[in-house]
């Protein structure tokens, strides 16, 4: 710890630190070596000044290096490229599970989706809460998850299963009761290291910085979005987008109408607990969900299909997602994944 003291001193003086220095600090955290008081001081110092691109990237580097390894997928999967559909959470709205449901649709439409998720942060039902309702084994072995990705086009990676070291920060984060750098790290530390990302953030001020971070982390293509209060592509208002493509970042707004969708009220997307949200997801994936639910999922799946190269525009992606939902293929995929996650046919638990 003593050799890191000069880094702490610079933080306390309001100075920025490098990507490598931040990586060193966060490596201490995930190895359980950092004093909780020092950890709190570090996180608050960064928060008060505002975390830099290098600092967020360095923290992600440390957590990815410490994570349980995800086995290399097949050559076909690597050639096509992997996409994640993920949000920071913490937007304060308790909506249905849009990004999780969208993952099934994007995969059923042809994308290779490795979704990294956790239990709920702000809503009554997070990604893993929902999946457990469908009998999807969240603690499946990494080899089983890899086989699901190769064979079915979809796997879910439960964050605590891969990032055990993050538990060392939990007491400090709970005691601070405020957002810190950890609140934006979750979407950045997918152990499958996706090539493409649709990433929703809880604050419009984060859209550009997080896109810069994805570029620094060598993500090939991405859309970072904030949809009128939600960490999703919105159907109730405009979505602010920063798109990363071929090393360039462009910023624009996307409306529901531009995607060929009707505008809904945000109240139409209200979620409930895991059991109720599971029934909502089941209805959507079977092709008879409520219009606002179906279109919200199609918008997000459609943008994921676009960013992963399956379609030439978000509009085309959304149309393909709607066709996929109407066919019921996404629900069949859910059933296949539940079966595969619990069986030894694709790997060992």
UniProtKB/Swiss-Prot annotation:
It comes from the Bacteria. One of its GO terms (molecular function) is magnesium ion binding. Its cofactor is Mg(2+). Its EC number is 2.4.2.18. 5-phospho-alpha-D-ribose 1-diphosphate binds at residues 87, 90-91, 95, 97-100, 115-123, 127. One of its GO terms (biological process) is L-tryptophan biosynthetic process. Anthranilate 2 binds at residue 173. Anthranilate 1 binds at residues 87, 118. It catalyses: N-(5-phospho-beta-D-ribosyl)anthranilate + diphosphate = 5-phospho-alpha-D-ribose 1-diphosphate + anthranilate. Mg(2+) 2 binds at residues 231-232. GO terms for cellular component: cytosol. Pathway: Amino-acid biosynthesis; L-tryptophan biosynthesis; L-tryptophan from chorismate: step 2/5. The keyword Transferase applies. Mg(2+) 1 binds at residues 99, 232. Belongs to the anthranilate phosphoribosyltransferase family. This is Anthranilate phosphoribosyltransferase. It comes from Shewanella loihica (strain ATCC BAA-1088 / PV-4).
């Amino acid at each position: 710890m003593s050799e890191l003291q000069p880094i702490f001193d610079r933080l306390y003086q309001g100075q920025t630190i490098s990507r490598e220095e931040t990586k060193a600090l966060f490596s201490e955290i995930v190895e359980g070596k950092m004093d909780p008081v020092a950890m709190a001081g570090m996180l608050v110092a960064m928060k008060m000044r505002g975390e830099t691109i290098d600092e967020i990237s360095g923290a992600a580097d440390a957590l990815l290096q410490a994570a349980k390894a995800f086995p290399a997928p097949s050559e076909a999967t690597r050639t096509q490229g992997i996409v994640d559909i993920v949000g920071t959470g913490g937007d304060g709205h308790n909506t249905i599970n849009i990004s999780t449901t969208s993952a099934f649709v994007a995969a059923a439409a042809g994308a290779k989706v490795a979704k990294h998720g956790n239990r709920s942060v702000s809503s009554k039902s997070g990604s893993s809460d929902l999946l457990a309702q469908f009998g999807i084994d969240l603690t499946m072995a990494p080899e089983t998850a890899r086989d699901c990705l190769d064979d079915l086009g979809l796997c879910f990676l439960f964050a605590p299963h891969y990032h055990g070291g993050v538990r060392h920060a939990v007491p400090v984060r709970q005691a601070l009761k405020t957002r810190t750098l950890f609140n934006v790290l979750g979407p950045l530390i997918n152990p499958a290291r996706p090539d493409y990302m649709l990433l929703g953030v809880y604050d419009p001020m984060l859209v550009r910085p997080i896109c810069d971070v994805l570029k620094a982390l060598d993500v090939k293509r991405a859309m970072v979005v904030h949809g009128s209060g939600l960490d999703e592509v919105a159907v109730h208002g405009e979505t602010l987008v920063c798109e990363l493509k071929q090393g360039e970042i462009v910023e624009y707004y996307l409306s529901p109408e531009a995607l060929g969708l009707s505008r809904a009220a945000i109240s139409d997307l209200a979620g409930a607990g895991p059991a109720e949200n599971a029934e909502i997801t089941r209805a959507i994936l079977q092709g008879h969900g409520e219009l606002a639910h179906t279109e919200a999922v199609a918008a997000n799946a459609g943008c994921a299909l676009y960013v992963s190269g399956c379609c030439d525009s978000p509009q085309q992606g959304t149309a393909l997602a709607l066709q996929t939902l109407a066919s019921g293929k996404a629900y069949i995929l859910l059933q296949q994944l539940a079966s595969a996650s619990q069986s030894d046919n694709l790997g060992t638990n």
